[in-house]
Amino acid sequence: MEAKQREYHFTKNAKAFTDMFSEDFLSINKGAINKPSRNNSYEMFDEYFKSTEFLKWDDNKAPVIRFSNDGSVAYVAVDKVVIVKMLNGNGKGIMDTANFAWLTVYKKYKNEWKIDCVTSTNK
């Protein structure tokens, strides 16, 4: 699923990316817990992807992957370097590099893994 997320960032496919989210999706970021609707998530990521060119979205370390005993829940902890060019209205871009660590919680719904929660930090 991490490979698909990377693909959707580079291809700017907000629809496919947010289709990975469960109906109960939670986002924990910048000291806040949010439960955005799928449509709100789509609109936010669509706008973000349209204004961003991803140059690098790579692991600094191998992801840590764990599963619940019954196999219905999993989590993946990642440490990534992300390099982007933020595009502005005049066609020029501003380069930005960030190191992110995040935890993605996956839950199985009708034999399909969905993203239930993402907790993200960056330095």
PLM features: what roles do these ranges have?
Residues K80-N88, Y106:
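Beta-strand elements of well-folded, non-transmembrane domains
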Residues A14-S72, A77-D79, I94-A98:
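A solvent-exposed, acidic/Ser-Thr-rich amphipathic alpha-helical stretch
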Residues T97-K123:
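Short beta-strand edge/turn micro-motifs at domain boundaries
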Residues N90-K92:
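Extracellular loop and loop/strand-boundary signature of outer-membrane beta-barrel proteins
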Residues Y8, I28-N29, K85:
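Short, solvent-exposed loop/turn elements at domain surfaces
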